[in-house]
């Protein structure tokens, strides 16, 4: 069973920045803003791990059994996903094949984003957003309820060096790496890219929901 402690949200972002330079059959992750991870996911939940076991999940093209880790979880809150609670989370058996380990202690709460498998099940990989709940900033926690969803039609583009420019009005530049040399910087922790009434997108910072004046602003 996987026993490594789960990294914090900032560590997850750092892992994505470094990527996964592994063989062709392994996974490779590109850094993304937490809002992008939310928007790309079918399911986003806050949950606690209850138990874990290795299970068979069919066979590969050569007839060999495919192993996966099945985590039984207790869902605390669903931010995005089906009406049915998530009871089981599946992942590959090791990080070498893109598996995402959860802490074996079972006491930590996590923010988990991944793909739905239906019937109360979901699948996660090393590239998905999985972080200890305590490592999620207060602004990020607020954004999970509505703000991230308000910008899922926007495009967040990573800026690697200054200067960089938007290519369209529905784009937000993610400059944490260019400005701070980290991916888990101020924009990742405190900002959401929100679509405004004129169709343009802009970064919004703050705990409170955006005021109508912000949403009604039009780009010149």
UniProtKB/Swiss-Prot annotation:
<keyword id="KW-0481">Metalloenzyme inhibitor</keyword>
<feature type="disulfide bond">
    <location>
        <begin position="159"/>
        <end position="164"/>
    </location>
</feature>
<dbReference type="InterPro" id="IPR001134">
    <property type="entry name" value="Netrin_domain"/>
</dbReference>
<comment type="function">
    <text>Complexes with metalloproteinases (such as collagenases) and irreversibly inactivates them by binding to their catalytic zinc cofactor.</text>
</comment>
<feature type="disulfide bond">
    <location>
        <begin position="154"/>
        <end position="201"/>
    </location>
</feature>
<feature type="binding site">
    <location>
        <position position="27"/>
    </location>
    <ligand>
        <name>Zn(2+)</name>
    </ligand>
</feature>
<feature type="disulfide bond">
    <location>
        <begin position="29"/>
        <end position="127"/>
    </location>
</feature>
<dbReference type="InterPro" id="IPR008993">
    <property type="entry name" value="TIMP-like_OB-fold"/>
</dbReference>
<dbReference type="InterPro" id="IPR001820">
    <property type="entry name" value="TIMP"/>
</dbReference>
<feature type="signal peptide">
    <location>
        <begin position="1"/>
        <end position="26"/>
    </location>
</feature>
<keyword id="KW-0483">Metalloprotease inhibitor</keyword>
<dbReference type="GO" id="GO:0008191">
    <property type="term" value="F:metalloendopeptidase inhibitor activity"/>
</dbReference>
<feature type="disulfide bond">
    <location>
        <begin position="39"/>
        <end position="152"/>
    </location>
</feature>
<dbReference type="GO" id="GO:0046872">
    <property type="term" value="F:metal ion binding"/>
</dbReference>
<dbReference type="Pfam" id="PF00965">
    <property type="entry name" value="TIMP"/>
</dbReference>
<keyword id="KW-1015">Disulfide bond</keyword>
<keyword id="KW-0732">Signal</keyword>
<keyword id="KW-0964">Secreted</keyword>
<keyword id="KW-0862">Zinc</keyword>
<feature type="site" description="Involved in metalloproteinase-binding">
    <location>
        <position position="67"/>
    </location>
</feature>
<protein>
    <recommendedName>
        <fullName>Metalloproteinase inhibitor 2</fullName>
    </recommendedName>
</protein>
<dbReference type="GO" id="GO:0005615">
    <property type="term" value="C:extracellular space"/>
</dbReference>
<keyword id="KW-0479">Metal-binding</keyword>
<dbReference type="GO" id="GO:0034097">
    <property type="term" value="P:response to cytokine"/>
</dbReference>
<dbReference type="GO" id="GO:0051045">
    <property type="term" value="P:negative regulation of membrane protein ectodomain proteolysis"/>
</dbReference>
<dbReference type="InterPro" id="IPR027465">
    <property type="entry name" value="TIMP_C"/>
</dbReference>
<feature type="site" description="Involved in metalloproteinase-binding">
    <location>
        <position position="61"/>
    </location>
</feature>
<dbReference type="GO" id="GO:0031012">
    <property type="term" value="C:extracellular matrix"/>
</dbReference>
<feature type="disulfide bond">
    <location>
        <begin position="27"/>
        <end position="98"/>
    </location>
</feature>
<feature type="disulfide bond">
    <location>
        <begin position="172"/>
        <end position="193"/>
    </location>
</feature>
<feature type="region of interest" description="Involved in metalloproteinase-binding">
    <location>
        <begin position="27"/>
        <end position="30"/>
    </location>
</feature>
<feature type="region of interest" description="Involved in metalloproteinase-binding">
    <location>
        <begin position="95"/>
        <end position="96"/>
    </location>
</feature>
<keyword id="KW-0646">Protease inhibitor</keyword>
<dbReference type="InterPro" id="IPR030490">
    <property type="entry name" value="TIMP_CS"/>
</dbReference>
<dbReference type="GO" id="GO:0009725">
    <property type="term" value="P:response to hormone"/>
</dbReference>
<feature type="site" description="Involved in metalloproteinase-binding">
    <location>
        <position position="40"/>
    </location>
</feature>
<comment type="similarity">
    <text>Belongs to the protease inhibitor I35 (TIMP) family.</text>
</comment>
<feature type="domain" description="NTR">
    <location>
        <begin position="27"/>
        <end position="152"/>
    </location>
</feature>
């Amino acid at each position: 069973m996987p026993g490594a402690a789960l990294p914090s949200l900032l560590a997850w972002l750092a892992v994505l920045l470094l990527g996964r330079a592994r063989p062709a059959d392994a996974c490779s992750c590109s850094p993304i803003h937490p809002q992008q991870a939310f928007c790309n996911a079918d399911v986003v939940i806050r949950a606690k791990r209850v138990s874990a076991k290795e299970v068979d999940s069919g066979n590969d093209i050569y007839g060999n059994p495919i192993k996966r880790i099945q985590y039984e979880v207790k869902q605390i809150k669903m931010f995005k996903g089906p009406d049915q609670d998530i009871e089981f989370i599946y992942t590959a058996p090791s990080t070498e094949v893109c598996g995402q380990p959860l802490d074996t202690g079972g006491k930590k709460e996590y923010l988990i984003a991944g793909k739905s498998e239906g019937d109360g099940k979901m699948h996660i990989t090393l590239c998905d957003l999985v972080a200890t709940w305590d490592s999620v900033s207060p602004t990020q926690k607020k954004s999970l309820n509505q703000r991230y969803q308000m910008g899922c039609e926007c495009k967040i583009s990573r800026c690697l060096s200054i200067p960089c420019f938007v290519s369209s009005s529905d784009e937000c530049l993610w400059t944490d790496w260019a400005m701070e040399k980290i991916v888990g910087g101020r924009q990742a922790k405190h900002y959401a890219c929100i679509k405004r009434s004129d169709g343009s997108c802009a970064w919004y910072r703050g705990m409170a929901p955006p005021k109508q004046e912000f949403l009604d602003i039009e780009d010149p």
